[in-house]
């Protein structure tokens, strides 16, 4: 058996250890005495059969429970089990699985060695909830979204690991999450920063810690270059007001041809001028510019905001800042690497379209919370299987699998997996072999000549064999 598959089987077996699950159930007071619903059955029901917990009537859920476990359960009894203790139980299992998924995927031998230990993307997914949840999860306050939820994800691209998942109300801005992110230690990382998380102090902290970043630039960001001929006082000291020259990105891009890219080195960011980086500007083609402007105006209309001319003009360019040396990433590679952010959008598409995390009707809050943690646990388990399989297939067959296809195919195994997963390593290995075979037959990414895959783009920062040795010393 492939050693990665064997390691995965062992990891899943440990994660679904029945003794550990029962201990968590007792510690959380979910199980206080022997009853018709066991901790194992409740976990199985929420994780493997829970896509409709917040959409199906209780009578259907009770009927499904009977079909799966051969236990006739009144719908009122099932409803009572969705309580504060079951929420705590599911939350603790979720935390355990988050750690397990991180541990499993980060310990796999890398198929691709790069200049960076990790390539990290931060983003969030939001969706509207029934208005009854507005006390716990307040929304924007309007009629359309009195209640909404936001799930923040730190995603590591090289392994597929969900480094962290945090749950907030829908009114929490992405930039506020930077306070939470401070507690996570930075390694030799490359962070692809979205504008929602753009804060100069945060980028400055990354730079100071030795963490690499590529970030888009906001239209109102102050950018400066050192004045080559500053004014001086008679004593020879430089006049502070003339030490730097403010630059305008839009004006710099005006003489460029469509599709042309330029780079300015030693750019100072922000009014304090404490962060120095490279600035890369690309003038977009008329076609791309028109698409951007259309989407921008539609977004303004939808949110009922005031049109800002500078922000509108900014749609004619791509502008990035990075502290990565040009010896590692050239100016023409910066946009390609930043475009890897699309991978997290694929993950969120999986969350919504396949795991239906956003399909919530009016139910009691505890039922929703059990549903949410159940979906997240299912996603953690699935991502561990999918990304381990992806690594194996890339290594053995030199082919890439499509994450969308793989996740979609994997959930077809959930009914069988739900029972085999508690039987031990042999049974888990057997079903994982079947899943791997399925991915090889039906999950391979279709070739599109006009589009590079994520793996192709990551090769831009690949370490050659002689460099691996040098970096290890």
From Swiss-Prot:
InterPro entries per record: RNaseH-like_sf, Transpos_IS4, Transposase_11
Origin superkingdom: Bacteria
DNA-binding in keyword set: yes
Coiled coil: none
Keywords of the record: DNA recombination, DNA-binding, Transposable element, Transposition
Single GO MF annotation: transposase activity
Entries under Pfam families matching the protein: DDE_Tnp_1
Cited SUPFAM superfamilies: Ribonuclease H-like
GO biological process, one term: DNA transposition
Similarity annotation: Belongs to the transposase 11 family.
Function statement: Involved in the transposition of the insertion sequence.
Name of this protein: Transposase for insertion sequence element IS1151
Organism from which the protein derives: Clostridium perfringens
